[in-house]
Design a protein with these regions (language model features):
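Bacterial N-terminal signal peptides
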Residues: 7-17
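Formylglycine-dependent sulfatase
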Residues: 2-4, 21-318
């Protein structure tokens, strides 16, 4: 799935190959999907990002630098990768269409593993984050967990945000809470539990773990914000509308403007731009810590030599 045109996507695959993996017919597979992740990682040369766990694992595997998505929208990008079919083929260009409406006999990646004797499990955001597109019983050995999370208490921690209304409240949050307060920490804990369960089973497994950060809102425990000096966060050099580009190229973007602290006209101040970028990096470091937990559990269970680990972002953020 490669495009010859520029796309707003970053895909990072890390695959750990060992002799024991290559010598076996059915190694385990751990697939980690990270929502809205661009190449803001040390292993991709980002001088700001603090991502020691992913960077360490990348040194043991393969980092792809030319992997592109088919469309820079969550649902079509994820479904295109998981089916091996273009968005135009599965006729999914939005967040609400199920790919089986156009291709009922399509075989997804987890479905393929399931059909060959694997335990196929899903925790977090994999196919999509809610509604019909996130449901596909054919792909999984048991129902997905935490695939559709709408509870504000799992998205926010500060009381001023919990008192708000609607799904979108503040666009970022730095709170003195543990990693386990937000949904991604819960997904990591549940994934670790399921890893132990799968390790005790004689069948190989395909475990898909989907983290929601660094997707908006940029909410992460304060300790990850504190890893960065706010004044050192770079903001875009050019914030104006590109000359001769169509209006729809930059307007309207409800993804960001739907949050309560973002002007409806989309005019972001330099201070707010720096805050948002700070929050994005904090979320990346938060996810790096959770990925580190998963890898540590693989090692503790002595599964790392017989497990292929794949980590990717569905598309980037700009």
């Amino acid at each position: 799935m490669f495009l010859s045109r520029l796309v707003i996507l970053f895909l990072f695959f890390e695959v750990a190959f060992y002799p024991s993996v290559l010598g076996q017919v059915k190694p385990n597979v751990l697939m980690i999907a990270v929502d809205d992740l661009r190449p803001a990682l040390g292993c991709y040369g980002d001088q700001t990002a603090i991502t020691p766990n992913i960077d360490r694992w990348a040194k043991r595997g393969i980092v792809l630098e030319r992997a592109y998505c088919q469309q820079a929208v969550c649902c079509p990008s994820r479904l295109s990768m998981l089916t091996g079919l273009r968005p135009d083929t599965i006729r999914v260009w939005d967040l609400n269409t199920h790919f089986r409406e156009a291709k009922p006999n399509a075989v997804t990646l987890p479905q393929y593993f399931k059909n060959t004797g694997y335990q196929s499990r899903s925790i977090g955001k994999i196919l999509h984050g809610g509604g019909a597109p996130s449901k596909d019983p054919e792909s999984w050995s048991s129902p997905p967990m935490y695939d559709n999370v709408r509870d504000p208490k799992l998205r926010y921690a500060l009381q001023k945000n919990l008192n708000g209304k609607g799904l979108k409240r503040a666009a970022s949050e730095s709170a003195e809470v543990s990693d386990d307060h937000y949904i991604d920490g819960i997904v990591a804990n549940e994934s670790i539990r399921v890893l132990g369960e799968l390790a005790a089973n004689k069948n190989p497994f395909f475990l898909a773990v989907g983290f929601r950060k660094p997707h908006l809102p940029f909410n992460a425990p304060k300790k990850y914000w504190d890893l960065y000096e706010k004044e050192e966060i770079q903001i875009p050099k050019h914030g104006s509308h590109p000359v001769n580009s169509p209006d729809w190229a930059t307007r309207s973007w409800s993804e960001l403007e739907g949050y309560t602290d973002i002007p409806v006209d989309g005019k972001i101040t330099k201070a707010k731009a720096r805050e948002l970028r700070h929050g994005y990096y904090a979320c990346v470091s938060y996810i790096d810590e959770l990925v580190g937990r998963l890898i540590a559990e693989l090692e503790r269970l002595k599964l790392e030599d017989n497990t292929i680990v794949l980590l990717y972002g569905d598309h980037g953020f700009h």
